């Protein structure tokens, strides 16, 4: 989120759907899903993985990039559904939608993580619970830092 707010790589700050609307008149993903955020998450995860694992650069960097891709791509279906439900980008549509706003990317991460790291069901459940809770807590902190407009 901080990266997206910085005045860097402005050419990537365009919405992924480029303003395209479907037959229902709504945007595909909305203004908040930008190439800068999508690619930034992949790069952030790749660099973080390399810094944490300190194995061969290519191994760690590519593994992190894969997991960043999983995280970023999993946010898109939720954004698509929210547009169909006329929920404004950056807003939630009730408790169920708030849950999916926090859990969508974690679900993608847990589904694609086994490709690079085998998981037991208990590990997958733990990652899901801790990841979703962490996502919510970080969003609340971003709200108090005035980097997000709503808490959840």
Locate the predicted segments by residue:
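Selective transmembrane helix interface/packing segments
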Residues: 115-116
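Interhelical loop and helix-boundary elements at the membrane-water interface
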Residues: 1-49, 53-68, 72-111, 121-152
């Amino acid at each position: 989120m901080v990266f997206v707010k910085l005045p860097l790589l402005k050419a990537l700050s365009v919405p992924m759907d480029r303003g395209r609307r479907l037959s229902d008149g709504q945007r595909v993903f909305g203004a908040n899903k930008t190439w800068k955020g999508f690619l930034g998450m992949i790069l952030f995860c790749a660099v973080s993985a390399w810094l944490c694992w300190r194995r061969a650069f290519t191994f760690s960097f590519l593994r992190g990039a894969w997991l960043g891709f999983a995280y970023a791509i999993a946010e898109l279906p939720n954004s698509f559904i929210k547009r169909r439900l006329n929920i404004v980008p950056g807003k939630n549509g009730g408790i169920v939608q708030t849950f999916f706003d926090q859990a969508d990317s974690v679900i993608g991460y847990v589904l694609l993580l086994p490709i690079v790291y085998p998981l037991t069901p208990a590990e997958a459940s733990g990652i899901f619970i801790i990841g979703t809770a962490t996502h919510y807590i970080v969003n609340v902190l971003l709200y108090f830092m005035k980097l997000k407009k709503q808490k959840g």
